């Protein structure tokens, strides 16, 4: 098995066996559920109370720059958008021929089903791109839109994205568990 296939399989096993099955049946109510006050989420345009919001469609993402300390609790909707745009979307566009996306130009999903469709498509493109990398590709820093955007070798970037998806996916699963047991 090539290195790129091992890297892709590390995340794909987690995706198939743990994360993606846990997202089945996600409802819109869960997607937007705010477990505490002042959560960041995806909201209809013009309704955000966050310092900033971005998005090109009817729905926008709450955020601030710089990030507040402590960071607000986020909804499943926000976490999925973060994975779709920040973790995967930028890099799919930069390195694997996908569309260019950023916080301000992305059309955020207004339903759980739409978000899961976006996630599935972006994940599949990322994973296929990783599987297609050669050992030479993995050893050198990727050529992104801005020099130094990802300053470590591509292999390090892939490992970082694997960690990010496992980490943020676990947060989403915890929010689902809390939702099920709410009062």
For the regions a language model picked out, list residue spans one by one.
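Short, contiguous alpha-helical
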Residues: 2-105, 143-183
């Amino acid at each position: 098995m090539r290195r790129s296939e091992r890297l892709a399989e590390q995340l794909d096993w987690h995706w198939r066996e743990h994360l993606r099955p846990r997202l089945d049946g996600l409802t819109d109510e869960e997607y937007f559920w705010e477990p505490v006050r002042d959560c960041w989420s995806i909201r209809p345009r013009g309704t955000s109370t966050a310092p900033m919001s971005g998005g090109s469609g009817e729905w926008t993402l709450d955020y601030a720059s710089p990030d507040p300390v402590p960071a607000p609790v986020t909804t499943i909707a926000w976490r999925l958008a973060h994975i779709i745009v920040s973790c995967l979307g930028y890099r799919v566009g930069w390195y694997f021929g996908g569309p260019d996306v950023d916080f301000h130009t992305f059309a955020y999903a207004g339903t759980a089903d739409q978000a899961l469709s976006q996630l599935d498509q972006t994940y599949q493109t990322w994973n296929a791109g990783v599987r297609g990398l050669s050992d030479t590709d993995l050893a050198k820093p990727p050529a992104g839109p801005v020099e130094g955007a990802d300053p470590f070798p591509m292999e390090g970037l892939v490992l970082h994205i694997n960690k990010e998806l496992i980490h943020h996916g676990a947060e989403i699963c915890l929010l689902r568990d809390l939702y099920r047991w709410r009062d």
